[in-house]
């Protein structure tokens, strides 16, 4: 794990971040996601997929955040001011893995194992 500038720490236990333009171009990156254009492309594909969800499935609902959950870390993806923010967050605190619930209505995808993972 790389050390990041304190200014770029968006959340506690953050181990990486990407900031993208709406078209997927990487504006900034750091930590485990430093210069990770592959992950940026995968996430843009996921975001494009969410735009094709049938309105009758989720009427009058707008996705505010996507969480991709793994055993030891998770990704939180949101959009603000025409930028896409992707944060990789460790579930460990002082070497102890904590568990999180992903039953939130904002959670779109949950995969607890790394075996079929797209982002790892």
UniProtKB/Swiss-Prot annotation:
Residues 93-120 are annotated as: Disordered. It is found in: Lysosome. InterPro entries: LAMTOR4. Residues 97-107 have a biased composition (Low complexity). Keywords: Lysosome. The keyword tRNA processing does not apply. One of its GO terms (biological process) is positive regulation of TORC1 signaling. GO terms for cellular component: lysosome; Ragulator complex. Belongs to the LAMTOR4 family. Part of the Ragulator complex composed of Lamtor3, Lamtor2, CG14184, CG14812, and Lamtor4. Regulator of the TOR pathway, a signaling cascade that promotes cell growth in response to growth factors, energy levels, and amino acids. As part of the Ragulator complex, may activate the TOR signaling cascade in response to amino acids. This is Ragulator complex protein LAMTOR4 homolog. The gene is Lamtor4.
């Amino acid at each position: 794990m790389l050390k990041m500038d304190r200014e770029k720490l968006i959340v506690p236990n953050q181990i990486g971040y990407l900031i993208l333009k709406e078209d997927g171009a990487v504006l900034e990156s750091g930590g485990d996601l430093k210069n990770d254009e592959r992950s940026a492309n995968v996430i843009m594909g996921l975001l494009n997929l969410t735009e094709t969800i049938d309105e009758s499935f989720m009427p009058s609902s707008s996705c505010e955040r996507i969480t991709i959950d793994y055993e030891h870390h998770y990704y939180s993806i949101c959009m603000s001011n025409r930028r896409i923010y992707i944060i990789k967050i460790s579930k460990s605190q002082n070497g102890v893995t904590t568990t999180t619930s992903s039953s939130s209505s904002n959670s779109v995808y949950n995969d607890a194992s790394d075996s079929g993972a797209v982002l790892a």
